[in-house]
Each structure stands twice: as structure tokens, then as C-alpha cells.
């Protein structure tokens, strides 16, 4: 059985994983103030160029989801490439309509399509995608894969935790007032967030990167004891030094058996701003 795994561009999937695990990415869109729209393609040079452009932009662009037709074209393309099944893992349905577009399109094609609402975002999404691919390569059926992913998501084995370091984008996006943004930047305030039951939840404000990193690991510690085995995707929006420091600190408390760094794409960066640092976590084994 030949299965194509498809994620949306908010997954921030590591570039090397796309070929290694046969994971494809369908873009969301960035819409600039003058009406120009551009796809959130998973291309290294495009992403680096976007970081520069959004820093220089006078306003924060808006974003939009893939259309039903976008998904339909992808499904039909995979059928032409002789895939038997398509497995789609999307950004949380509580954060975007992408899941709904994927489901509606699946009803209009004659290739089996299974759509999973991961209730996750960013670097957490490629982790269940990799689990699915490894299970399929070991002979699992698509039904067994879906059951395992459901079990592990309910067990909170996949997590997305990060911090926002620049209030300018929260101000430009209308999320905080100019005064709050001024004070936040002046005091080097970092806003720590995580995905909980599919929703983006701010849980702490701290001063400086070091305290923000400590707050991220403290959030992980709530249900994952120190010494547990982890697979980690470190993500960042034009702040690789920050994510390296985060991973170095994480390794002091956890057994990180696999790690990779992946830049955040255009759409995620639009919402959180350059400078953001975080990680997608897969708990492989919780220490008793």
C-alpha cells in the first residue's frame, strides 16, 4: 500500500524529513496590505527572505487557509502518482479552517483520504507524521496508524511550547496596545505559550530569554518527568542562536535521543513574529 502523508505549511516540517519520510506540505497563504498574496512554500531561501521582509514591513500581513480546491488538486495529483491512500495531518481546527478544507475536499475525490486534526501547531505536527510513516514502513495498516496516533495524542505525547520575544508584531497584529508593546520591549518581556487541547494558551510573561527558556521547560515538566526520553524539533523565526540555547538547556534535564532544528514558515512567523523560539516534543518514554 502506497501512502502519501500530507501536512500543511504551519507544520514547520524539517526539510530533510520531507524526502526521508515522504511528507509533503500544502501551503497556507500570506496576504499583504496591498492585496498581494503569496504561498507559504517550504523552501529555505524563501523563508529566510521572508524574515527580512516582514521585519521591514510597516504592517503585519494577514493569513489565509488552503482552499478546498487546493486540497482537491493535491489529492488528484497523488492519485496520478499511483498513491493508494492520502493521510493528512493538519494544524488544530481551533486555530484555522485548514482541517475543514481538507475534509470537504476528501469527499470530492475517488482516492481514500484520511484527515487527522492534530490539535497541534508548528514543530509538533511533523512528529506524528513521522510516527505514521515508520509504522507504515513496518507493515501497519492505515487503520492501525490512525488508532495509534489517536492514542498518543490523547496521552499528550506530542507538545508545542514556545515564547514570543518581540512585542512589535503583537502590536502590529492588534493583539496588544502600543503602550503594552513599548513596555514589553523595554523590559525585554517574553510571552510563553503552549498548545492545550488545540488552543494557543499564553501561560506566563517573564523577563529575558534565559527565564523564558526555563519557563518552557517548566511547562514540559508538568506532565513529563525529568529524565524522560524525548524526540525534539527545535523551531525558530530567525533566531537560531535562541533555539540552540533552548535545546542545550533541555538536554540538562531530559534524555533527548533525537533532535533537529527547523525554521518557522511564513504563516507561523506572521502570527508570532521574528525572534520566536520553541519546540515540538514527542515523549518517547516517560520516566517512572
UniProtKB/Swiss-Prot annotation:
Residues 3-283 form the DegV domain. Keywords: Lipid-binding. The keyword Glycosyltransferase does not apply. It holds the Pfam family DegV. Hexadecanoate binds at residues 63, 96. InterPro entries: DegV (IPR003797), DegV_C (IPR043168), DegV_domain_contain (IPR050270). GO terms for molecular function: lipid binding. NCBIfam families: DegV. Binds long-chain fatty acids, such as palmitate, and may play a role in lipid transport or fatty acid metabolism. Monomer. This is Fatty acid-binding protein TM_1468.
